Amino acid sequence: MASITMMSSFLGGSTVAPAKVPSANRRGVVMVKAMHEGENNVVISKNEESKNSGRRELFFAMAAAAACSVAKTAMADEEPKRGTPEAKKKYSSVCVTNPTARICRY
C-alpha cells in the first residue's frame, strides 16, 4: 500500500490536509440502524473485492496513460525546417518575442 501513496506524489495531485485545531475536537452522535446478518456479509464481501482490485485498476490506468502518451508522441508531425515560413507560422509567438531564435532564422 505504500506504493500507492508514493504514486500520488508522482502524479502531482496530492495535497496536504490542513492541521486540525485541538479546540475544535468535538464528536457528533452517530445513529446506526440494526442490519440483518445476511446484509452485513454481502457488504463485507464487496469491500474485500474492491480492496483487491483497487491496486490492479490503478496500474491498468497508469499503463493506459503511458500507452496513450507514447502513441501521441509517435503520431506527432515532424518539425518544420528552421527559417521556413511554416516554422515561422508554427512558432509565431516565439518569433515575435525573440526574432533571433534559431527556429525563426536560417
UniProtKB/Swiss-Prot annotation:
Expressed in midvein, lamina and periphery of leaves (at protein level). Residues 1-76 form a transit peptide. Disulfide bond. It is found in: Plastid, Chloroplast thylakoid membrane. Keywords: Chloroplast, Disulfide bond, Membrane, Photosynthesis, Photosystem II, Plastid, Thylakoid, Transit peptide. The keyword Cytoplasm does not apply. GO terms for cellular component: chloroplast thylakoid membrane; photosystem II. GO terms for biological process: photosynthesis. InterPro entries: PSBT. Disulfide bonds join C95-C104. May be a component of the oxygen-evolving complex. This is Photosystem II 5 kDa protein, chloroplastic.
